[in-house]
Amino acid sequence: MGSISQSHKRQPLELQGHLASFKAFDCTPVLGTEFPDAKLAEWLQAPNADDLIRDLAITISQRGVVIFRSQVDLTDELQKTLVQKLGELTGKPSDSTWHIHPLAKYNPTGDSTRHLITTDPKNKPAEDRFRNQAEQPMGVRAAWHTDISYEPNPADYSCLKMVQLPTNGGGKWPQLPILTPVERHGTMANAKCANSIEQSDTLYASSYEVLDKISPAYRKFLETLTATFAQPRYNQSSQEKKSEIHVEPRGSPNNVGSDLSAIHPVVRTNPVTGWKGLYGAGMHTRRFNEVTADESRRLADWLLQMIVENHDLQFRHSWKNPYDVAIWDNRAVFHAGIMDYKGQGHRTGHRYVGVGEQPYLDPESKTRREALGEFN
């Protein structure tokens, strides 16, 4: 897992300037970019759509996460197309498509690749997200993760579109409705959101910057390690719901069965940027394989502490409007939802997750700051 084959040696992709005419700003110096006025549906339907989406993918891989506001015209089908194009245009394996959640057979939505992330009981969620957080032995800090790292071929790009938001803490604002495709073009689609929601935020942390904060000597040690990633909770949830795990291919021929575990390098190379970043940390990381059990526990706690306590590598994204969209590269960031809205309404989002390559480490790859000529 720590080595590299010749097939993995590829040149990083470079921006071609196709997004330069669109207003954008960086959310923090190292992480996050927002396009406040751009419309993803228009980009997908433009004559130069592939050029736009390729530059978008590179931007996401460099900046970690990109934000778009009020994407009322981005249907689920367009969102799904976008996620696949982001990967295809940047070299994902030809047999990688969209991830199918292991619990997809419970409350199927008609599209097994659309993951309904919701706290609304009317949507019959497969899991109680508030209960899951309350049962974490380390509290909310244990929520940090990268998507589907328990799969042999984990996620490249994830796209979350928020369609229902909780009210604010004072409870003064009406509950935002989930719009039908017809209603998206009605009064709600054209209305300004007077109540700027400051709840149900999502935190992102740069896996590039975490690695850059670690000394070169300790980085070399981490680069020799692999970790076992797993998610046993889904098997427990399927039993509680009297359902079953989706054991057929989940977006890749390699992602099959009910074991829901995989071994990956602790430090991996992002093939889009050529930069290496920390990968073995957070919720799904169960064991560092080349060290003792005690060393593994201490290492897991320290790496998570690096993410939690270094605020300069974090970005807190606020979901403010219906149909706000966040797209992130799971090879570049960790993320965690903030469950601070219990009793204030429900949050529902539609997420599509692209499946990428099997993680690898190119020993010749550089950290982000090394590649950009920046040094601490």
Curated annotation (Swiss-Prot):
User: SUPFAM superfamilies recorded for this chain?
Assistant: Clavaminate synthase-like
Which EC class does it fall in?
Answer: oxidoreductase
Q: Which PANTHER family match?
A: ALPHA-KETOGLUTARATE-DEPENDENT SULFONATE DIOXYGENASE, TAUD_TFDA-LIKE DOMAIN-CONTAINING PROTEIN
A single Gene Ontology CC term? cytoplasm
> Which protein, by its recorded name, is this?
Alpha-ketoglutarate-dependent dioxygenase esdpJ
User: What protein family does this chain belong to?
Assistant: Belongs to the TfdA dioxygenase family.
Binding residues for Fe cation: H145, D147, H335
Query: Which species is the source of this protein?
Result: Penicillium shearii
> Where along the chain is composition biased (Basic and acidic residues)?
239-249, 363-376
Q: How is the cofactor bound?
A: Binds 1 Fe(2+) ion per subunit.
Q: Where does 2-oxoglutarate bind?
A: T202, R347, R351
The taxonomy runs:
Eukaryota, Fungi, Dikarya, Ascomycota, Pezizomycotina
Q: Which UniProt keywords apply?
A: Dioxygenase, Iron, Metal-binding, Oxidoreductase
